[in-house]
Regions:
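Interaction-interface detector
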Residues: 1-141
Length: 141
C-alpha cells in the first residue's frame, strides 16, 4: 500500500506486558487515538536508510527505509520504497534501494575527483533512460 501519513510514536508506547517492543501494541494505540484500522499502521524506523542503521549497527536496520508520504509498502520484502526514479530501474532488496538495470554508475577517475575538489569541473554520472546508460557530464562546462 501507499504511505499516506507518517506519525512518530515513542517506543515505550509499544511495549507489551513483558516490556518488549511489539508492533501490534503500537497499532492498537494508533487505532484508538487516530480512528484508523490497526492493520493500516506499519512500523518504520527513523534511523534506517538503504537497509543501513544510522548507529552503524546494521542489525538494527528495520524495513529498509524510513517511510515517507508517497512511499510504497512492499509486504513481501518488508521494505518501504521511495518513488521509482526511472521505469527501467529494479529493486535492490539487499540495500533497499532502486538500482539501474546495469548497476551503479561507474566511479569517477582520480583525475575527475581532483578536478571536482578543485572546483574546476563538476563531473557526475547521470542516468540516460532512453540509452539505458550512465552518461558522464561536467555540469560546470
Amino acid at each position: 500500500g501507499k504511505v499516506i501519513q507518517v506519525l512518530t510514536m515513542d517506543n515505550d508506547k509499544m511495549l507489551n506486558a513483558d516490556g518488549v517492543e511489539d508492533e501490534t501494541v503500537g497499532q492498537q494505540w494508533l487505532e484508538t487515538h487516530n480512528n484508523w484500522p490497526a492493520q493500516m499502521w506499519i512500523q518504520t524506523s527513523y534511523n534506517t536508510r538503504n537497509n543501513k542503521h544510522g548507529s552503524g549497527d546494521d542489525s538494527k536496520a528495520f524495513r529498509g527505509n524510513y517511510a515517507g508520504i508517497g512511499y510504497i509498502w512492499d509486504e513481501d520484502n518488508q521494505i518501504f520504497w521511495p518513488k521509482k526514479p526511472y521505469a527501467s530501474w529494479v529493486k535492490n532488496t539487499t540495500d533497499a534501494r532502486w538500482q539501474s538495470p546495469i548497476g551503479d554508475a561507474p566511479a569517477l577517475t582520480a583525475e575527475q575527483e581532483a578536478q571536482n575538489q578543485a572546483n574546476t569541473n563538476n563531473w557526475t554520472y547521470n542516468w540516460n533512460e532512453s540509452g539505458q546508460s550512465w552518461d558522464l557530464t561536467d555540469t560546470l562546462a
